């Protein structure tokens, strides 16, 4: 009898050993074990419990630090990158994306095989074999041996067969997602996406873990593991962007007085969960202007005082949500009994059949219940003085002396409103204002009237776009204009005037020289003692003209001055 007990104990032990040796999903995918409450209340649609058995024969399990990881991929290690569009409003879908990054010079081709990139050299140099992994050939060999596409190794770790959708043989990576005590298996290529509905997910941060396997003949080899934290919230994720026309830096939340600020509300809703919801925006700008309620996601507001203000925004949306439990049916009214009767009836009270209450039959749960969800945003805004406006009131062409240079100088007379600028910048571009040709910035010293002249150089004639900016520590004010610079041809009015002045000057100098020469000759060949006074006075002008004629026309006169003297004597 004692031997029989030993034999039965041995059989029980032998039967128990395979159960103890078999791994489960939670043993492979993570050490964090959710509580029984979380397992019960976080049921994800299409996911399975991690209490299921893991097929370790097809999908070997390697711990971190195992030396086999170094040889899991030819040419290096594969890195998996896990991202999500978290945070997610409870009830909406959250999407996870996994992308595989291969070693240098490797990529996935159109057939799902891993090949070397052309003309790419890695540490091992150029490879004669174009394939890193030729899974197409492996798949054909496997089908040839089995004679059918239904193979015992085309299954997931829990034994479920691969879905045979078109092109499934080109998908050679197996992704196992694990969160909240549940797992999801997916066959894919070098990148996959998985969406999860968060209606039953506990609020707060949660952990998603992913293990990636690759084909290896008739089995699979782990190549990467990755994890990431995602957040499920009952608050609408809200972001607000603020923009002001002349604000120098919108990220510092410092803005200008007397200029409108545009507030734009961005709701993080990548799954479009709130597309059919009515959304209300309630604003409090903190400047005693009261509350402003709108259904538009953009609003403008102008602060008229300097200082610091607290901005508050509340977003309200009616979103699909769980229906509240029906209220308990009202008890039928009865005459008020005595205390002893009450105690007796309480002890013997038993619930009656549900059909006795006609109200219970009409209480059918509404499947389209809605619940109000709220989102909040707060910011502290500083309002300061700034340059509000800038205008170009006059443009003047600066006249240059001869020789005329190739460039032109233009003076811009500029006025501004608001604070006093400390610098001026001009950007000279083509007529479309897209191709910048020149940028000049310089400090300025402006009086309280804010009137200044900016001189800029233009290289050559043509039409230019001029952007002129006045700035200080907190603001930038911009104005633009188109200017046409004329061609500087030699026949310009100023050039002609200068040429005329030069010609007149040269003529005056020439006449002066001739007059001096004539005067010198007249003094040398007109003896005073031999000429009577009356003749000199009456004939002086004739003599002067004759002598000038002799100088200009020497061929028609006698060359001997003695003959001239004799002639004048004969006349007298």
Swiss-Prot record:
A GO CC term assigned to this protein in UniProt: plasma membrane
Gene3D superfamilies associated with the record: Immunoglobulins
Gene name, Swiss-Prot/TrEMBL: GPNMB
Signal peptide feature range: 1-22
Resulting phenotype, residue 531 to I: In a breast cancer sample; somatic mutation
Purpose: Could be a melanogenic enzyme.
Spans within the Extracellular topological domain: 23-498
Residue stretches making up the PKD domain: 240-327
Origin organism lineage: Eukaryota, Metazoa, Chordata, Craniata, Vertebrata
Record's compositionally biased regions (Pro residues): 321-335
Molecular functions per Gene Ontology: chemoattractant activity; heparin binding; integrin binding; receptor ligand activity; syndecan binding
Motif Cell attachment site mapped to chain: 64-66
UniProt keyword terms in alphabetical order: Amyloidosis, Cell membrane, Disease variant, Endosome, Glycoprotein, Membrane, Phosphoprotein, Signal, Transmembrane, Transmembrane helix
Protein location: Cell membrane; Melanosome membrane; Early endosome membrane
Gene Ontology biological-process annotations: cell adhesion; cell-cell signaling; negative regulation of cell population proliferation; negative regulation of cytokine production; negative regulation of G1/S transition of mitotic cell cycle; negative regulation of T cell activation; negative regulation of T cell proliferation; negative regulation of tumor necrosis factor production
Pfam families on file: PKAT_KLD, PKD_4
Protein name per Swiss-Prot or TrEMBL: Transmembrane glycoprotein NMB
Membrane topology label: Single-pass type I membrane protein
Family: Belongs to the PMEL/NMB family.
Biased composition (Polar residues): 338-351
Phosphoserine modifications at: 542
Tissues in which the UniProt entry reports expression: Widely expressed, but very low expression, if any, in the brain. Expressed in the epidermis with higher levels in melanocytes compared with keratinocytes and Langerhans cells (at protein level). Expressed in peripheral blood, but not bone marrow mononuclear cells. Expressed in tissue macrophages, including liver Kuppfer cells and lung alveolar macrophages, in podocytes and in some cells of the ciliary body of the eye (at protein level). May be overexpressed in various cancers, including melanoma and glioblastoma multiforme.
Disease: Increased expression levels in glioblastoma multiforme biopsy samples correlate with poor patient survival prognosis. Has been proposed as a potential target for antibodies coupled to cytotoxic drugs in the context of cancer immunotherapy, including that of melanoma.
Protein origin, superkingdom: Eukaryota
Induction, per UniProt: Up-regulated by G-CSF/CSF3 and M-CSF/CSF1 in bone marrow mononuclear cells, hence up-regulation may be linked to differentiation.
């Amino acid at each position: 009898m004692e031997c029989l007990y030993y034999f039965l104990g041995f059989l029980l032990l032998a039967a128990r050993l395979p159960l103890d040796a078999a791994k489960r999903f939670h043993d492979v995918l993570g050490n964090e074990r959710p509580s029984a409450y979380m397992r019960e209340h976080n049921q994800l649609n299409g996911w399975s419990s991690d209490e299921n058995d893991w097929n370790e024969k097809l999908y070997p399990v390697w711990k971190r630090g195992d030396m086999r990881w170094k040889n899991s991929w030819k040419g290096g290690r594969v890195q998996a990158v896990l991202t999500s569009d978290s945070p997610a409003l409870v009830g909406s879908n959250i999407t996870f994306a996994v992308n595989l990054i291969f070693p240098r010079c490797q990529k996935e081709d159109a057939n799902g095989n891993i090949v070397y990139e052309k003309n790419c050299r890695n540490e091992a140099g150029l490879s004669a074999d174009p394939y890193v992994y030729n899974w197409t050939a492996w798949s054909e060999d496997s089908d040839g041996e089995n004679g059918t596409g239904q193979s015992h190794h085309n299954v997931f770790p829990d034994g479920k067969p691969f879905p045979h959708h078109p092109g499934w043989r080109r998908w050679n990576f197996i992704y196992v997602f694990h969160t909240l005590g549940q797992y999801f298996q997916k066959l894919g290529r070098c990148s996959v996406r998985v969406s999860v509905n968060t209606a039953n997910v506990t609020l707060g941060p949660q952990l998603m873990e992913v293990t990636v396997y690759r084909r290896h003949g008739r089995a699979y080899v782990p190549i990467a593991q990755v994890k990431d934290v995602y957040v499920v919230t009952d608050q609408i994720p809200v972001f607000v962007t603020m923009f002001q026309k002349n604000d120098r830096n919108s990220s510092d939340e410092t803005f200008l007085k007397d200029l409108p600020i545009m507030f734009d509300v961005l709701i993080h809703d990548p799954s479009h969960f709130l597309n059919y919801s009515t959304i209300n925006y309630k604003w409090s700008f903190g400047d005693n202007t009261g509350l402003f309620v709108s259904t538009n996601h953009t609003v403008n507001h102008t602060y008229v005082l300097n200082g610091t203000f607290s901005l508050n925004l509340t977003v309200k949306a009616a979103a699909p949500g769980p229906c509240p439990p029906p209220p308990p049916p009202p008890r039928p009214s009865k005459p008020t009994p005595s205390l002893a009767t009450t105690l007796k009836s309480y002890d013997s009270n038993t619930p009656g059949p549900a059909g006795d209450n006609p109200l219970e039959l009409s209480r059918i749960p509404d499947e389209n219940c809605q619940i109000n969800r709220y989102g909040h945003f707060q910011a502290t805004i500083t309002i300061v003085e700034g340059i509000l406006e800038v205008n170009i009131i006059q443009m003047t062409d600066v006249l240059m002396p001869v020789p005329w240079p190739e460039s032109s100088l233009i003076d811009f007379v500029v006025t501004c409103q608001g604070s006093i600028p400390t610098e001026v910048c001009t950007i000279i571009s083509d007529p479309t204002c897209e191709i910048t040709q020149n940028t000049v910035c310089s400090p300025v010293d402006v009086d309280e009237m804010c009137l200044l002249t900016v001189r800029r150089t233009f290289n050559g004639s043509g039409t230019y776009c001029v952007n002129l900016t006045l700035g200080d520590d907190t603001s930038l004010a911009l104005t633009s204009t188109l200017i046409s610079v004329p061609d500087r041809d030699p026949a310009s009015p100023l050039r002609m005037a200068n040429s005329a002045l030069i010609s007149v000057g040269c003529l005056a100098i020439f006449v002066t020289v001739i007059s001096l020469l004539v005067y010198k000759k007249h003094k040398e060949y007109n003896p005073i003692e031999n000429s009577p006074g009356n003749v000199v006075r009456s004939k002086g002008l004739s003599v002067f003209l004759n002598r000038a004629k002799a100088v200009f026309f020497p061929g028609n006169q006698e060359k001997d001055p003695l003959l001239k003297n004799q002639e004048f004597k004969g006349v007298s």
